[in-house]
């Protein structure tokens, strides 16, 4: 089984998705694999010059490019070329673990021993970051002590964040929502940080 499929199935099981839904999604993905679908990445700057990376899966790249460009332009942003925004990010392996699974201190020690670069604990989960080349080796080490993973993925993590005031927060949220409404959009990454 390929690593992306294994990761997706594990995330679905962690979210208590019914087995029938998982099987239906796998069947649909095999139809997609037989079609002319492409993974495309768009980069640009949205409201307040926040950097964005938008990952898509499409059977019509002209339609998708037009839709994404229009969304950026209507928000006062601009769609850039490959590399125009991604230099603000680092692509890393990200492993999320249920907070109830292990204590903050123990996960930190375990993550370091497994070869992770960083480990952060949040209210509901622990997040471990590592090189994309090491993600499955790190996870394999973690699996020796942990059974309840929320997700394993490759993500664009911002190197520096742009802080946005509450006045501009709604504008950015609307931009995110408009991007998410596009059927071809799979993932959205930004370097925004909302001020308190």
What are these regions (language model features)?
Residues 1-4, 39-47, 79-89, 147-159:
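Flexible hinge/switch segments at interdomain interfaces of large molecular machines
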Residues 1-56:
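Translation machinery proteins
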Residues 8, 68, 107:
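Aromatic/hydrophobic pocket-lining residues that form π-stacking "cages" and hydrophobic walls in ligand
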Residues 9, 13, 26-30, 72, ...:
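Structural signal for hydrophobic packing residues in well-ordered secondary-structure cores
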Residues 16-21, 61-64, 103:
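Helix N-cap / loop-to-helix initiation motif
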Residues 43-57, 62-90:
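RNA pseudouridine synthases
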Residues 91-196:
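Positively charged, low-complexity, intrinsically disordered RNA-binding extensions
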């Amino acid at each position: 089984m390929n690593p992306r499929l294994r990761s997706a199935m594990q995330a679905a099981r962690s979210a208590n998705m019914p087995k029938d839904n998982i099987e239906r999604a796998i069947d649909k993905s095999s139809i997609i694999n037989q079609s002319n679908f492409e993974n495309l990445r768009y980069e640009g700057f949205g409201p307040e010059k926040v950097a964005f990376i938008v990952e898509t899966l499409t059977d019509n790249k002209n339609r998708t490019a037009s839709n994404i460009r229009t969304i950026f332009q209507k928000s006062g942003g601009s769609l850039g070329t490959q590399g125009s925004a991604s230099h603000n990010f680092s692509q890393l392996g990200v492993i999320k673990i249920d907070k109830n699974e292990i204590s903050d201190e123990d996960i930190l020690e375990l993550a370091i021993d497994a070869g992770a670069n960083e480990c952060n604990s949040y209210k509901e989960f622990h997040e471990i970051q590592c090189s994309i080349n090491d993600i499955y080796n790190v996870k394999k080490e973690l699996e020796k002590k942990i059974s309840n993973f929320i997700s394993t993925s490759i993500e664009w993590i911002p190197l520096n964040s742009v802080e946005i005031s509450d006045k501009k927060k709604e504008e950015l949220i609307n931009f995110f929502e408009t991007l998410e409404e596009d059927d071809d959009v799979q993932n959205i990454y930004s370097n925004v940080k909302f001020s308190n």
